[in-house]
UniProtKB/Swiss-Prot annotation:
One GO biological process term: translation
InterPro entries: Nucleotide-bd_a/b_plait_sf, Ribosomal_uL23-like, Ribosomal_uL23/eL15/eS24_sf
Classification lineage: Bacteria, Pseudomonadati, Pseudomonadota, Acidithiobacillia, Acidithiobacillales
Subunit annotation: Part of the 50S ribosomal subunit. Contacts protein L29, and trigger factor when it is bound to the ribosome.
The protein, known as: Large ribosomal subunit protein uL23
GO (cellular component) term, any one: ribosome
Length: 97
């Protein structure tokens, strides 16, 4: 993976009640990732950007929701989420206040 691609794979951390619970119980961190990203690319990007050891990566594809404004029907973009399990002692600080 080239240097630019690792910055395009991880789009944002997913911060929710479920992701916080999974983080505390299983040392897993949740990210919104590019739809065309593979598990190998996600693993490589997390290891290089955060300098941690990744044990496993699980991904989920989500279809965009259909939204309506008056008579007009539109659709939100589909997206992909990755659950990244880190080795014991490894952690990621999102920098959230």
């Amino acid at each position: 993976m080239n240097a630019e691609r690792k910055y395009l794979v991880l789009l944002a951390p997913v911060i929710s009640e479920k992701s916080t619970m999974v983080q505390q119980q299983a040392n897993q961190f949740v990210f919104k990732v590019a739809r065309d990203a593979t598990k190998r690319e996600i693993r490589s990007a997390v290891e290089k950007l955060f300098e941690v050891q990744v044990l496993s990566v699980q991904t989920c594809n989500y279809l965009g929701k259909e939204k309506r404004v008056g008579r007009h029907v539109g659709r939100r973009s589909s997206w992909k989420k990755a659950y990244v399990r880190l080795a014991e002692g490894s952690s990621i600080d999102y920098g959230v206040a």
